[in-house]
Curated annotation (Swiss-Prot):
InterPro entries: Flu_NP. GO terms for molecular function: RNA binding; structural molecule activity. SUPFAM superfamilies: flu NP-like. This is Nucleoprotein. One of its GO terms (cellular component) is viral nucleocapsid. A motif (Bipartite nuclear localization signal) lies at residues 198-216. Residues 1-21 are annotated as: Disordered. It holds the Pfam family Flu_NP. A motif (Unconventional nuclear localization signal) lies at residues 1-18. GO terms for biological process: symbiont entry into host cell; viral penetration into host nucleus. Encapsidates the negative strand viral RNA, protecting it from nucleases. The encapsidated genomic RNA is termed the ribonucleoprotein (RNP) and serves as template for transcription and replication. The RNP needs to be localized in the host nucleus to start an infectious cycle, but is too large to diffuse through the nuclear pore complex. NP comprises at least 2 nuclear localization signals that are responsible for the active RNP import into the nucleus through cellular importin alpha/beta pathway. Belongs to the influenza viruses nucleoprotein family.
């Protein structure tokens, strides 16, 4: 990459820091998760949660959502200017679950946002600690990615629902900064840009005036983020075309959809980080561990180690399978929703099954669900091996994939060949190579056609024993490539937003 010199590692983006060496990065990431842990402990005290209740993932999510809501400036401002009946713009809350006489009860709590902000800042040495907030957003985003399909959102923007492997981070708020941008998939960026262009088509003032100038800057910035994810010159050149367009319209939408399709084979670089629920960091801080002193990394062994030693509980509905509930959360913790199931299974040490075969709904419980029948279980979040998370799409080559999801986006740097369904993908590229991007389109199609099965991605990278913290002895697994590798294969997962 030409721009390598100016790139910050995404640990640095995560902590908002300038260039730092490895030790400083580990320390600042440690400070970030330590702050989350301290905040969580304080909230458990405020809410008088028992140790068990504090380890309940549903309680963790409510507490995380409260602090995110308390710091959501734009929404807070909007709520104050547009008061809606029954919603106090100065308060935030949610369901907290407590165990009374052997039964789980739901308690709706309400707190002043100001109070939550005070507790958060106090846990973070008086700072706003936006990095920690983004970290929580990415954990929620990873959980959504593992739980829901984005079929409807894809179809609405004119994309193919089988392109779901490109949709990482599609539920991340816009305000998630550089760290958020790094984990967004190519499809997510394309979808955001298409929505913007469509608004411009329908509203002639969208690009005009002082607001329009700001809109234009945002548009070009998003184009540059997407351009930076592509690994080939032709894809990047096409992004320049889209960015420089005087009046973005249907031609740009066409180009973007073409680029999204091309990313199924010529994969973009999408960062992966293991972001854990706040209660996990809370448990570790409570045990006396000093994250900042010891240092921490989101992409190495550390999150695996935390999960090896933490007990997290979850509420479970009567007909749900605890093993499946655990798989869902494990995938979310490691940002592995679009990873090849064979790789995930090897690392986890137990079979990871496609979404359609899971007997479990999402982790969160709706307010109208009956608590009488709820039970709780221990989530099994341990793994057999660990592997370094990747920020590249790997080299591409051909391999059998499935009907429901026709490509993968690797999470772990593990040597393998990457499955994609060439016939299905190439069928979408018939005909249309005319117009101002014709030479780039032709070049991209040529590269896609010549992607070979022999090319192994992540040459020589493997998985590591949990005792091998310095990653000295890679174990390169061999995968049975005749099996199915896609998670959203022929799937019936719920839509996000139900």
């Amino acid at each position: 990459m030409a721009s390598q010199g100016t790139k910050r590692s995404y640990e640095q983006m995560e902590t908002g820091g300038e260039r730092q060496n490895a030790t400083e990065i580990r320390a600042s990431v440690g400070r970030m998760v330590g702050g989350i842990g301290r905040f969580y402990i304080q909230m458990c005290t405020e809410l008088q949660l028992s140790d068990y209740e504090g380890r309940l993932i549903q309680n963790s999510i409510t507490i995380e959502r409260m602090v995110l809501s308390a710091f959501d400036e734009r929404r807070n401002k909007y709520l104050e200017e547009h008061p809606s009946a029954g919603k106090d713009p100065k308060k935030t809350g949610g369901p907290i679950y407590k165990k009374r006489d052997g039964k789980w009860m739901r308690e709706l709590i309400l707190y002043d946002k100001e109070e939550i902000r005070r507790i958060w800042r106090q846990a973070n040495n008086g700072e706003d600690a936006t990095a920690g907030l983004t970290h929580l957003m990415i954990w929620h985003s990873n959980l959504n990615d593992a739980t829901y399909q984005r079929t409807r959102a894809l179809v609405r923007t004119g994309m193919d629902p089988r392109m779901c492997s490109l949709m990482q981070g599609s539920t991340l708020p816009r305000r998630s900064g550089a760290a958020g941008a790094a984990v967004k998939g190519v499809g997510t960026m394309v979808m955001e840009l298409i929505r913007m262009i469509k608004r411009g088509i329908n509203d002639r003032n969208f690009w005009r005036g002082e607001n329009g100038r700001r809109t234009r800057i945002a548009y070009e910035r998003m184009c540059n983020i997407l351009k930076g994810k592509f690994q080939t010159a032709a894809q990047r050149a096409m992004m320049d075309q889209v960015r420089e367009s005087r009046n973005p319209g249907n031609a740009e939408i066409e180009d973007l959809i073409f680029l999204a399709r091309s990313a199924l084979i010529l994969r973009g670089s999408v960062a992966h980080k293991s972001c854990l629920p706040a209660c996990v960091y809370g448990l570790v801080v409570a045990s006396g561990y000093d994250f900042e002193r010891e240092g921490y990394s989101l992409v190495g062994i550390d999150p695996f180690r935390l999960l090896q030693n933490s007990q997290v509980f979850s509420l479970i509905r009567p007909n749900e399978n605890p093993v499946h509930k655990s798989q869902l959360v494990w995938m979310a913790c490691h940002s592995a929703a679009f990873e090849d199931l064979r790789v995930s299974s090897f690392i986890r040490g137990t079979k990871v099954v496609p979404r359609g075969q899971l007997s479990t709904r999402g982790v969160q419980i709706a307010s109208n669900e009956n608590m009488e029948t709820m039970d709780s279980i221990t989530l099994e979040l341990r793994s057999k091996y660990w592997a370094i998370r990747t920020r590249s799409g790997g080299n591409t080559n051909q391999q059998r994939a499935s009907a429901g999801q026709i490509s993968v986006q690797p999470t772990f740097s593990v040597q393998r060949n990457l499955p994609f369904e060439r016939a299905t993908i190439m069928a979408a590229f018939t005909g249309n190579t005319e117009g101002r991007t014709s030479d780039m389109r032709t070049e991209i199609i040529r590269m896609m056609e010549s992607a070979r099965p022999e090319d192994v991605s992540f040459q020589g990278r493997g998985v590591f024993e949990l005792s091998d913290e310095k990653a000295t002895n890679p174990i390169v697994p061999s995968f049975d490539m005749s099996n199915e590798g896609s998670y959203f294969f022929g799937d019936n997962a719920e839509e996000y937003g139900n």
